[in-house]
Amino acid sequence: GLRRGDSDFDYVSAGDINRNGLIDAYDISVVATQLEDGIENPGTDRVAGTIFLSTPKQTYNAGETVEITVKGDSVKAVNALSFALPYDQQDYDFVGIEPANLGTMENLTYDRLHTSGQKALYPTFVNLGDKQVLEGSEDLFTIKLKTKRKVTFNLKAVDGILVDKNLNMQKF
């Protein structure tokens, strides 16, 4: 979740392998695919599909919990995923993530306050070593936010990527 411009980005900027100004699932995958004896035969399946977010309603009163369902849509060969969910800290507090259908992926989600003052949640899930990839269309996890005041939910995922075992990327 570190972005170019954060006070500590320069310390880890060499880890921004894809040079997009953000430490994301791709950068983490470069190392993660080599852990736990690595991936001997990554196969030829190329990453595909998309991810979308939904909530049961649009308007929430202060103190309510917003449950954001994160669903994979026709995903194929997904070995890692990440996106940013910028939000106004005057409106929400991050409560947690409930994994649903993520297999053995490690949850590396981080709720970050950037040096610029922008708050963003970075849901990030990565397989370490050679593990089962995500396939199909199903709910992957739920993000829970607590409202601080009455809000109309309009948060959007940005900088979303899916990564396969060969480090091919699919943006969403």
What are these regions (language model features)?
Residues 1-8, 20-42:
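Alpha-helical segments with a strong preference for the paired helices of cellulosomal dockerin domains
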Residues 7, 11, 59-61:
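Alpha-helical context
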Residues 10-15, 48:
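Glycine-rich, flexible loop segments associated with nucleotide phosphate handling
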Residues 16-17, 128:
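Residue-level detector of alpha-helix boundaries and kinks
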Residues 29, 33-172:
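Acidic, low-complexity intrinsically disordered segments
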